[in-house]
Amino acid sequence: MIILEILLWIVIVLVAFRILIGIVRKLIHFPAPAFISIFLDSKARGWWQPPKDIIRFSNIKKGMKILEIGSGSGFFTIPAAKVLGYDGEIAALDIQQEMLDKITKKLEKEENSGIENIRCVKASAYEIPYPAETFDVVFTVSVLQEIPKPHDVLLEAHRVLKKGGTMSISEFIPDPDWPLPSTVEKQLTAAGFKNLKKHGNFFRYTITGVK
């Protein structure tokens, strides 16, 4: 009985914390700090947001040129790079140099030796430094809603995507900025994306749209 009470209180505290953080994030927009990468790179995240699922749902395939908006420390970047192979390329875009430095450090590890198709790009998602119709896929994971003007970001993503290219947005409910799937669908539609598809479930999903 005592154990159940403790577990209940833990759940209550976690829910309250998530609500509090969510309120703060609505009032003050800020990117996830670099130190949080210890959680973003955890094995637990590999269970609830498996990179292989994100890659599959996002239609990422060998030889493509793709862009990740808000790459963070590269939790999805490196697995995607391995799928792309030597003929493909991924641009890892993040506004924080500290996060991009973490990707560079990971690439020095033996298990990532030979990966040479990642380009780290420090830039704002409002002004993606690439010409129109550059990428086959643009994807973002638990990032879009923490940006003050997500519509502007999606318009930029639409610009740099090739015709017929895929825009992919993945979300998971523990994230304080988690949106309803219907919210993401409306955002994609408003930015000009069509043929929307939802993968996963209500709590953990990927929604894709086509340019």
Task: Locate each region found by the language model.
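Class I SAM-dependent transferase core
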Residues: L4-M64
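Class I SAM-dependent methyltransferase SAM/SAH-binding core
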Residues: L67-I69, S73-E127
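A short acidic, Gly/Pro-enriched loop at the edge of an enzyme's catalytic core
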Residues: Y126-V137
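A short SAM/SAH-binding and catalytic strip from SAM-dependent methyltransferases
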Residues: D136-K149
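A short glycine-rich, Lys/Arg-flanked "PGG" loop and its adjoining helix->strand segment in the class I
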Residues: H151-K163
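Conserved beta-strand signature within the Rossmann-like core of class I S-adenosyl-L-methionine
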Residues: G164-E171
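Conserved Class I S-adenosyl-L-methionine
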Residues: P179-H199
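Core SAM-dependent methyltransferase catalytic element
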Residues: A191-G192, G200-K211
